[in-house]
Amino acid sequence: VIDAARAHGFKSVSVDLIYGLPKQNVISFNRTLEQILALSPDRLSIYNYAHLPSLFKPQRRIMDAQLPSGETKLQILQLAIRRLTEAGYVYIGMDHFAKPSDELTTAQRQGRLHRNFQGYSTYAECDLLAFGVSAIGKVGPTYAQNVKTLDEYYDILDSGRLPVLRGIELTPDDLLRRAIIQALMCHFELSIESIEIAHLIDFRKYFAAELADLREMEKGGLLTIDDQWISVLPAGRMLVRAIAMVFDRSLPSDRERTRYSKVI
């Protein structure tokens, strides 16, 4: 498939890998990496397996004892980062790697990198149209998800309506937090002054609770905070999702206890 894509002029070929699968370990994942590196894709994404048996019935056949521990998953992620960087890939952040010549790497270097719910992208603030069962779309400050069963999807389309199950319109606070999360995930730094000017807030007053959480991460060597910038350190890049989650208002109140276990 990769050879065919290149033969037909595809500019970039991406491969997704999942870690945390049943019976997976560091040795087996290393074998997978060796096979993938031999194919030399332009981009790789390393995703954490989401075990949600309450939502996905086939996952109920998987026993919890078959799943690798959090420690093993962290070792797998560290292995992936080391092997891919040694092979010449640039660590874009979180879960993405790309060759130095790839446009994703160029966008990161030029400060044009963007992230949506599908991953990193070179296209900032584009509307996304959702086609298919359970697909999620974004238009302006709104998000919408389609219905989750094929029969219902076709029935609604046949009746001349859009098969939307639910949606949300972002509030000014949502837009503010989205801008902060985007900056941290894409550029690994946040200009406090820029946020204050763009959203007309006093950052330290508005995010007093969040800054207290970040101070704990600062003590752990994940980031630094000064008068004008929040900067993610190299050790924090692997956990930038957890850093960004501090600003996610939709998380439960006990987020501090569960943040790292959810990320790894």
Task: List where the protein language model places each region.
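Residues at alpha-helix caps and immediate loop-helix transition turns in enzyme cores, especially N-
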Residues: S28-F29, Y206-A209, I243
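A short, conserved structural fragment
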Residues: E218-Q228
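Minor-groove-contacting beta-hairpin "wing" of winged helix-turn-helix DNA-binding domains
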Residues: W229-L233
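C-terminal scaffold of the Radical SAM
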Residues: V1-R204, T258, K262-I264
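Short amphipathic alpha-helical interaction segments
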Residues: D202-E218
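Short amphipathic alpha-helical segments
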Residues: L175, A179, L190, A209-A212, ...
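Short, amphipathic alpha-helical interaction segments positioned at domain boundaries
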Residues: A235-I264
